[in-house]
Amino acid sequence: MTVWVGLTGGIGSGKSAAAQCFADLGVPRIDADAAAHSLTASDGIALPEIRRLFGDTVFDTQGLLRRDILRKEVFASPSRKALLESVMLPLIFSEIKKQQETFTDAAYGIVEIPLLTEKRQFISLIRRVLTISAPVEKRIGRVMARSGLTRGEVAAVISHQASESERLLLADDVLLNDGSLKSLREKTMRLHAFYSGIFASKPTQGKHND
């Protein structure tokens, strides 16, 4: 039976880079954001309900979701954000669970869930939580470099996410990603050895058990 580690962290912490390091070591990887994207891609099963709730203005003339428009709408309104989450979160949960069922031989796998701290229903899908942490200034710099967002825009996103202390309280393990990619790879290799050992002998190891 494959045991699942939930990998989480704030924007710019290096979640995806860490998850890729694990994947490079042969660890099964599931990405909640990728699942969400597939659900809202062309002919995605979430689209009819999104259209019903948000209207035609969030779609282009080809029927594709205008993600930028929808993102602005939900970012500006907590009630609209909650409405979108009521559609998306159950579908993402089901998609992750379906993907998990395709892996049975690996000792453990990684599920990348950015909002794990905020959306605790996903805890039931995992046995252990790995939080990727980084200094705020590094996080802001990384996001600005890759996205073109201003410092203020990145800071606004961070302010809407769970705090670092909240993530650390949830964590079984913490990886501090404050250096180079080489350093990140070395840290994930050590965690890989640790997880391979504990899950081979104690598959329920961790504080997030059924």
UniProtKB/Swiss-Prot annotation:
Cellular component, GO, one term: cytoplasm
Main location per the UniProt record: cytoplasm
Pathway assignment: Cofactor biosynthesis; coenzyme A biosynthesis; CoA from (R)-pantothenate: step 5/5
Domain of life per record: Bacteria
Every DPCK domain range: 4-202
Record carries keyword Kinase: yes
GO molecular function: ATP binding; dephospho-CoA kinase activity
Annotated InterPro entries: Depp_CoAkinase (IPR001977), P-loop_NTPase (IPR027417)
Disulfide bonds: none
Residues engaged in binding ATP: G12, S13, G14, K15, S16, A17
EC top class named in words: transferase
UniProt key word Cell membrane: no
Reactions it catalyzes: 3'-dephospho-CoA + ATP = ADP + CoA + H(+)
Stated role: Catalyzes the phosphorylation of the 3'-hydroxyl group of dephosphocoenzyme A to form coenzyme A.
Family to which this protein belongs: Belongs to the CoaE family.
Name of the protein in question: Dephospho-CoA kinase
Organism: Neisseria meningitidis serogroup B (strain ATCC BAA-335 / MC58)
Lineage: Bacteria, Pseudomonadati, Pseudomonadota, Betaproteobacteria, Neisseriales
